[in-house]
Curated annotation (Swiss-Prot):
UniProt record similarity statement: Belongs to the peptidase S14 family.
Official protein name in the record: ATP-dependent Clp protease proteolytic subunit
HAMAP family assigned to the protein according to its UniProt record, in alphabetical order: ClpP (MF_00444)
Pfam families: CLP_protease (PF00574)
Source organism of the structure: Alcanivorax borkumensis (strain ATCC 700651 / DSM 11573 / NCIMB 13689 / SK2)
GO annotation, biological process: protein quality control for misfolded or incompletely synthesized proteins
Tree of life domain: Bacteria
Molecular function terms, GO-annotated: ATP-dependent peptidase activity; ATPase binding; serine-type endopeptidase activity
A single cellular component GO annotation: endopeptidase Clp complex
InterPro entries: ClpP (IPR001907), ClpP/crotonase-like_dom_sf (IPR029045), ClpP/TepA (IPR023562), ClpP_His_AS (IPR033135), ClpP_Ser_AS (IPR018215)
Length: 205
């Protein structure tokens, strides 16, 4: 039996779930409780600390049960490519399928990770928004160093477009065109593009 405790005057605090067990009461923050149900949240900017936590949670859930799906809920404006790629590589590396769900928005690296979910298990809620574009970068310094970084960004752009083509089924030429500038999509448009497999208005029975 679970009870959700939340003080509405302290909205910055994470809600705590109190569970009644045979050994007495146990308390979990809401995210830890959902982790027991194999649910991981990717909320906010994609950066190293967040990525490390998500990778650790996926590895833990794999060790708990390598044959049961992991559910990754995404509401993110994007962020660091290298941090995002650590999540992506782990999703592909572990044995359980990772089902992805966009709630709110999945932009840039958020959209990339959304479409990286297991085939047939990539979803969005009806009013979610998705945005794809080319990687952003900025660097100051000597001209030779700027040139090195520009070449690196072009390599990353090619790598991301190639992976997006693999997961969406879009031709690489079309992806290069579509990611040249910010490209916003509704949930239905993201489904048509191949970023997700279905738009869910209600939880499947």
């Amino acid at each position: 039996m679970s009870q959700l405790i939340k003080d509405p005057t302290n909205l910055g605090l994470v809600p705590v779930v109190i569970e009644q067990t045979a050994r007495g009461e146990r308390s979990f923050d809401i995210y830890s409780r959902l982790l027991k149900e194999r649910v991981i949240f990717m909320i906010g900017q994609v950066e190293d600390h967040m990525a490390n936590l998500i990778v650790a949670q996926m590895l833990f859930l794999e060790s708990e049960n390598p044959d049961k799906d992991i559910h990754l809920y995404i509401n993110s404006p994007g962020g660091s490519v290298t941090a995002g790629m650590s999540i992506y590589d782990t999703m592909q590396f572990i044995k359980p399928d990772v089902s992805t769900m966009c709630i709110g928005q999945a932009a840039s690296m958020g959209a990339f990770l959304l479409t990286a979910g297991a085939a047939g298990k990539r979803f969005a809620l009806p009013n979610a928004r998705v945005m794809i574009h080319q990687p952003l970068g900025g660097f100051q310094g000597q001209a030779s160093d700027i040139e090195i970084h520009a070449k690196e960004i072009l390599k990353i752009k090619g790598q991301l477009n190639s992976l997006l083509a693999h997961h969406t089924g879009q031709p690489i030429e079309q992806l290069e065109k579509d990611t040249d500038r910010d490209n916003f999509m509704s949930a239905d448009e993201a489904k048509e593009y191949g970023i997700i497999d279905a738009v869910l208005s209600q939880r499947p029975v």
